[in-house]
Amino acid sequence: MAIYSNAQPNLVYLKFNGEVVQEIKDFTKTHPYLIGQIRIDKNSLDFPDIQHGEQPVIHIGVVNLSDRPYEPVLMHLPPYLQTKVEPNVLQKGEKGVITLTLNSERLTGLGLTQTSVYLSRFSGDKVGDENEIPVSAILLPDFSGMTEVEKANAPAISLSTKEVDMSAILAKKSKARQDITITNTGRSPLQINKLQVFHPAVGVNLKKSVLQPGESTRLRVTVVKKNIGKKRRHLRLLMITNDPMQPKVEINIKAKQ
């Protein structure tokens, strides 16, 4: 390297000695989930709550750790999901992004929709537990057209608890259950339009789905220990109601074995 200046001498040569090495990249923190020789930054996809007509987006960061060019592909896509990959092919050590767009108009109904997509690790890959990525979306009713008078006279849901801990019981028994009281504290009939579970280990029984003002009913929650397994799904319940202040009610369940 030559350096010219207005000093004396006005020309100086610099020599550098060293060894050129390839940059060492550690993706374990930015992309903590390993599927085959592919690292990703998300192993489940929970879309934000949506209303009819909205199209939320989720991004999955992908890194190719294999020695061959890799084309990221999500298999078993449902009709309400669309994907875009940039770049289409990843060389060794290269990062990319899979963009998923949810079309809410193609969801079948209110409440929770669950499915699984599968990340192809190589051309011709098959689906299995190792490359499964659970997907969930919740479609809510739209109360934006209600007047202030209608809101003032609307139903209102109240629960005795939204947190259920069955860990102590499941430590000794194979099944646990707990009752939750639901009350309509509003001024018009409360409708529980949907009651859904996120996990196959959870069961529910609701005595009444329509409550008059001041009326209560019982919701029984059951968890079967052997069905908890290793599924990456939330232990919680979801209710969709006609309460404009609480169209979605979630009940979280703890069930450490």
Residue ranges of predicted features:
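Beta-strand-rich interaction surfaces with strong enrichment in secreted/lumenal proteins
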Residues: 48, 85-90, 105, 167, ...
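Surface-exposed binding patches on compact interaction domains or structured appendages
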Residues: 67-95, 187-216
